[in-house]
Regions:
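A residue-level marker of the well-folded mature domains of exported/periplasmic proteins
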Residues: 4-5, 22-328
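Gram-negative bacterial Sec-dependent N-terminal signal peptides
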Residues: 1-21
């Protein structure tokens, strides 16, 4: 009888011990793997997990930037029984059914960077204020035209995919403020699908189709690097500037070569860090409808749709590129 009681107590102790160290499994889902922006976001996510202590971040994503590929990844995560999914979406609407299924099974859902429609998530974290991002891109283009001594010049946008939520929102915001920047003549929007080779081909196509093109604005960290390379390869340095949203580590060469005068971005490390904290806050039930924790970054204020903004974009140029290219 004593042996049986001892066994029961041992099993109970093991069960309690197991529950005490149970990990919160948070899946950080990128638009696609191999993209420096999302690799940097994962660095921040892992930092958040280390701070929280009881969180395991599973970094994953598809190899192609399609909704179908992300849906396959999401179904796998649902089958694994993760506690939360933090995703940068390839399509705002196509992912809703599978994410609804996840939420029905108790999985918390945060979208970050590129959002999911409200029905498919609980919180969305914009990297910055959308209107400010849009105007920053136009101002950068205007600054580039001024550096080229052009009073009014042709400007093209090289975006990611036609269904990319954040890219489309930023481009819409860019168009709204064009009247404030009369030097900027927007001629077209092209799509490189967040793929280096396609973005490069599209950039070359823009340079050939629009011989008077002066600036390419790419709000894609993949597209901006590809466009800068195209400008260099086509012998357009000093005649065409590339700007938009990019990573200092990937754009340092373009700034030094003269293919880019300046560009902007928020810190993707902070974005992954904040998304992980938000997911953890939802899992632990400490988030409210009005605000949620971003750890050391403070609280994010949420609107009626559950959306909030992290920080303002920051401009990088020859004066600071060396410093920040060593960080991300």
């Amino acid at each position: 009888m004593k042996i049986k009681l001892s066994l029961i107590l041992t099993v109970a102790a093991l069960a309690l011990s197991g529950s005490a160290v149970a990990e919160v499994k948070i899946a950080l889902v990128a638009k696609s793997l191999g993209n420096g922006f999302f690799e940097a976001a994962n660095v921040g996510a892992q930092e958040a997990a280390k701070e929280l202590g009881d969180v395991k971040v599973i970094y994953t994503g598809p190899t192609t930037t399609t909704a179908e590929a992300q849906i396959e990844v999401l179904n796998g995560l649902i089958a694994q029984g993760v506690d939360a999914i933090a995703i940068s979406a390839n399509d705002p609407d196509a992912l809703v059914p599978v994410l609804k299924k996840a939420m029905q099974r108790g999985i918390k859902v945060v979208s970050w960077d590129s959002g999911v429609a409200k029905a498919g998530r609980q919180i969305h974290l914009n990297p910055s204020n959308n209107a400010l991002i849009g105007e920053t891109n136009v101002k950068l283009a205007a600054d580039a035209l001024k550096a080229l001594n052009v009073e009014k010049g042709d400007v093209a946008v090289l975006s990611a995919t036609p269904t990319s939520t954040n890219q489309n929102t930023w481009i819409a915001e860019m168009k709204k403020v064009l009247p404030k920047y009369p030097s900027v003549n927007l001629v077209t929007v092209a799509y490189g699908d967040d793929l280096s080779d396609k973005s490069y081909r599209e950039a070359v196509g823009l340079l050939k189709t629009y011989p008077d093109l002066k600036v390419i604005v790419s709000p894609s960290s993949v597209g901006i690097v590809a466009a800068a390379q195209a400008v260099k390869d086509q012998g357009k340095i000093g005649k065409v500037y590339v700007t938009g949203l990019g990573l200092p580590s990937e754009m340092a060469g373009a700034v030094k070569s003269g293919a880019s005068k300046s560009f902007a971005i928020w810190n993707p490390i902070d974005l992954g860090y904040a998304a992980t904290y938000l997911a953890d806050d939802l899992v632990k039930g400490t988030a409210t409808k009005d605000e949620a924790s971003m750890g050391k970054l403070g609280k994010v204020k949420l609107d009626a749709d559950g959306s909030g903004a992290m920080a303002e974009p920051f401009v990088y140029d020859a004066s600071n590129i060396d410093k920040f290219s060593k960080i991300f």
